[in-house]
């Protein structure tokens, strides 16, 4: 929260994205990244603190600083955290949510579960962005059509293909 306040006060950001999507074992084995939403109280405290800090610092600076949250489906197929994390983030004032439609254990393997993006889109009142398996413009259009999501977050699909955003 202190870092978010500093960024807002120094006019170095127009939004803050809390990324709980990292599946890398050196991060998740310590409870960070994609594993953090499993720690519901800590997840709640972090999101609440950053939203509050951005609201307060933004008010002093005379501008709105939205906080967005990125999550994964969960740790694995038996430990789904997306529903609770998404509803919690919305309740705490997150401006939007991005779902990487894989579990932590999947890392980047297999197909992304776009149906989970559609499910969260139906569940939430805030904008939902989809992430996973978007490597070209046709993939982005397919995700928008299949899920009804409000936008696309491109990750690995832009590596070596920066023109994807132009397409």
Language model regions located:
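Flavin-dependent oxidoreductase catalytic cores
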Residues: 1-167
